[in-house]
Amino acid sequence: MYKRQDLDGTENKSKFGANAILSLSLAYYKAWSYSNFEAIFLSQGTENLIIPVPMLNVINGGQHADNEVDFQEFMILPIGFNSLTEALSSTHSVITNIKKELKSRSLNTNLGDEGGFAPNLKSHLDVLDLICDSILKAGYKLNDHFKISLDAASSEFYSNGKYNFEGNSYSTDEMISVYENICDKYPIFSIEDALNEEDYEGWVKITSKLGPKIRLVGDDLFVTNIQKLKTGIDEKQANSILIKLNQIGTVTETLEAIKLATENNFASIMSHRSGETEDSFISDLAVASRCPLIKTGSLARSDRVAKYNQLLRIS
């Protein structure tokens, strides 16, 4: 696809259009994979293949739901299981408990954009308490069996240098303190987009403070862009990257971003988008590129479940 990119001649592929270029890139990569290998997930070699740990959306907020919760996603990671089948089955038990608890409180059990519930809870603390209680009621242990990840999507509540979060206006340092308190109290694995993508000094601060404890994931910060990732690595902004094919526009560049991240001890998280199809290519690519994590919604909606089904077939 490099020749096609060179013909386009623009940094953001605006001449031919990123969607058109990505469609061609995907079609070529699939054809090449099936012509030379038995499957797409074998296209980058057969040694040290892993099944990524799923980050399953259980509660939606922010722009993905019609409620008062400012954080966009609350996810659970089934880390203490011997197989993907066992991990997903255990996750289903936790989700069932969440639904039961919401119904007992007469709260909405409709689903958000990515398959998680979208109840109108009072705060992020209410959501985290609900998730932890549901894990324990299912017979599992916090930290041993499940951890929690957040997508703060902080750019959505950032304005004029302040984070307008749950009725309060916070400076960068104050917002970092909010995250520190969360990490002290709950089994947090990662926080995505904890700060605004242009709050560069803030990213350095939060990485210094929380980086040794959790994964700080750059989505808006990096947008799967190799140059932005290089800057983040050099400046010590975040320690993980969200990988989205249609942000960068070609499979080749996506693989290069993952390679750069891996070489610099950044975790790569293969990700869906909020608007999805039933195509399961990202499941294959996550395995092929040895991504340790995959983020593709909840165990609901066919466009999300299709990715998990493909991972199950691979496993």
Regions found by a protein language model. Name each.
Residues 38-53:
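Glycine/threonine-rich beta-strand-loop-alpha-helix active-site module
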Residues 125-314:
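Catalytic core of soluble alpha/beta enzymes
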Residues 49-112:
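Mobile "lid/hinge" segments at catalytic clefts and subdomain interfaces of large enzymes
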Residues 1-2:
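Short, small-residue-biased leader/transition segments that mark boundaries at the very start
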Residues 6-18, 116-119:
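A short glycine/serine-rich beta->alpha loop
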Residues 73-84, 108-124, 153-166:
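Active-site-proximal beta-alpha loop/turn segments in soluble metabolic enzymes
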Residues 34-42, 136-143:
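Active-site phosphate-binding and catalytic loops of NTP-dependent enzymes
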Residues 19-35, 138:
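Stable alpha-helical structural segments in soluble proteins, enriched in small hydrophobic residues
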